[in-house]
Curated annotation (Swiss-Prot):
Residues 99-293 form the ATP-grasp domain. This is D-alanine--D-alanine ligase. One of its GO terms (cellular component) is cytoplasm. The keyword Cytoplasm applies. Binds 2 magnesium or manganese ions per subunit. Mg(2+) 2 binds at residues 260, 262. ATP binds at residues 126-181.
Length: 304
């Protein structure tokens, strides 16, 4: 089977994607697969470079990768791919839309407002949220462009910066609590990981710098673990995820708040999902096999 490892892309997370792709290539079973590295530098590259592969193993992140566009292109080309489908990918990439769905389903997520232009900034709404606040690009991952702000001046300055990353911004109530992440594979939960870091926020640098964070598998108290597991699986189902996903949460006063759901979480040595899988006895090469096998089954079930 010719496995195309799709990496690169046109988003701000291109370098993260290349790290993920190289890690996958180094650990795929060379006796089982013919591996075809495919680095995208522009959108049209996919159509030409992927035409002779049997399966696309996606190592992409951010826009044109994690947002459903590549998934839709591959479906048009008749090439099965890894992870969630086009619809789920697009929903999860849009923080505002995904939070609306989670709120509708009764899943706790921090209060927020969405902003598409500076002129629409409503200070009465901000006062209801209360500082500090978290400013995020509506579409993005790896905490790129994310910052905690403590007053209106800092907020306005950060909004100007984030609008350079994205046309929509999410301003979210800051939840100070215990940061955890829940990885799900084929509808089943992997061990929960706690994240403690030297930086105030688990930002881009912290995510890819082992020295700045402590990530460890934890056993939560039974009642809290049940709430966390229930919330993470509810997210996975409500947002129509498939194959694998990672649900990031903040726990405060015994309540798990969902921060976001990642349909193509990082897969480098420093990444959380592989660490969680390893804690469950699934080594990295085996995890890649399982992603390929499960994705092929799911695509078939979808009528692909």
């Amino acid at each position: 089977m010719r496995i195309g490892v799709i990496m690169g892309g046109v988003s701000s997370e291109k370098q993260v994607s290349i790290m993920t792709g190289n890690e996958m290539i180094a650990n795929l079973d060379k006796n089982k697969y013919e591996i075809v590295p495919i680095t995208l530098n522009e959108k049209m590259d996919l159509i030409e470079k992927a035409k002779d592969i049997d399966f696309a193993l996606l190592a992409l992140h951010g826009k044109y990768g994690e947002d459903g566009t590549v998934q839709g292109t591959l479906e048009s080309l008749g090439i099965p791919y890894s992870g969630s489908n086009m619809l789920s990918s697009g929903i999860c990439m849009d923080k505002n839309i995904s939070k609306k769905i989670l709120r509708y389903e009764g899943i706790e997520t921090p209060d927020w407002i969405e902003l598409t232009k500076m002129e629409d900034l409503n200070f009465d709404e901000l006062d209801k949220l209360g500082f500090p606040l978290v400013v995020k690009p509506n579409s993005g991952g790896s905490s790129v462009g994310v910052k905690i702000v403590y007053d209106k001046d800092e907020l306005i300055s950060m909004l100007e910066t984030v609008f350079e990353w994205d046309s929509e911004v999410v301003i979210e109530k800051y939840i100070k609590g215990e940061e955890i992440t829940c990885s799900i594979f084929d509808g089943k939960q992997l061990p929960i990981i706690s994240i403690r870091h030297a930086a105030e926020f688990f930002d881009y640098n912290a995510k890819y710098d082992d020295a700045s964070t402590i990530e460890e598998v934890i056993e939560l108290p039974a009642e809290l673990k049940e709430r966390v597991n229930k919330a993470s699986l509810a997210c996975y189902k409500a947002l129509k995820c498939s194959v694998y996903a990672r649900v990031d949460m903040m726990v405060k006063d015994g309540i798990p708040y969902v921060m976001e759901v990642n349909t193509l979480p990082g897969m480098t040595q420093a990444s959380l999902l592989p660490k969680s899988a390893d804690a469950a006895g699934i080594h990295y090469s085996k995890l890649l096999d399982m992603i390929i096998e499960t994705s092929l089954r799911v695509r078939k079930e979808e009528g692909f």
